[in-house]
């Protein structure tokens, strides 16, 4: 059965919250310098060097889109996980690795 918009937003919001919590922990424990801006369907992370990672809910497609300095990625919900449509990678390890590569900040989820 197809996911409803309500289910999509709940899953995406839970994921956004997990990312925000992990970053707040990194700020406390690693003195990380990250600005978090959650507004509507977008979660934007800005690092001390001015670079950004933007995570965006695409409701019509029920996808999560991520823009990093390394490229853009689209994740769909498959078998209980958010999966990159191009390479099959999972969302949370991807975000963790992207933040580490882009800012040097190690997150724990």
Swiss-Prot record:
State any GO BP term from the record. iron-sulfur cluster assembly
Q: Which GO terms describe its cellular component?
A: cytosol
| Database matches in Pfam families | Frataxin_Cyay
Listed A to Z, the keywords are: Iron, Metal-binding
Q: Which SMART domains match?
A: Frataxin_Cyay
Citing just one GO molecular function, the answer is: ferrous iron binding
Role this protein plays: Involved in iron-sulfur (Fe-S) cluster assembly. May act as a regulator of Fe-S biogenesis.
Instruction: Report the sequence similarity comment from the record.
Output: Belongs to the frataxin family.
Name of the protein? Iron-sulfur cluster assembly protein CyaY
Please tell me the species this chain comes from.
Shewanella sp. (strain ANA-3)
* Taxonomic lineage: Bacteria, Pseudomonadati, Pseudomonadota, Gammaproteobacteria, Alteromonadales
């Amino acid at each position: 059965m197809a996911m409803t918009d309500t289910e999509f937003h709940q899953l995406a919001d839970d994921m956004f919250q997990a990312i925000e919590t992990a970053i707040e922990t990194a700020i406390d424990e690693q003195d990380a310098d990250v600005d978090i801006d959650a507004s509507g369907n977008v979660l934007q992370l800005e690092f001390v060097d001015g670079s950004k990672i933007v995570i965006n809910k695409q409701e019509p497609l029920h996808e999560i889109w991520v823009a990093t300095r390394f490229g853009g990625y689209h994740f769909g919900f498959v078998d209980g996980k958010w999966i990159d449509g191009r390479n099959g990678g999972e969302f949370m390890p991807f975000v963790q690795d992207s933040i580490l590569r882009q800012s040097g900040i190690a997150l724990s989820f």
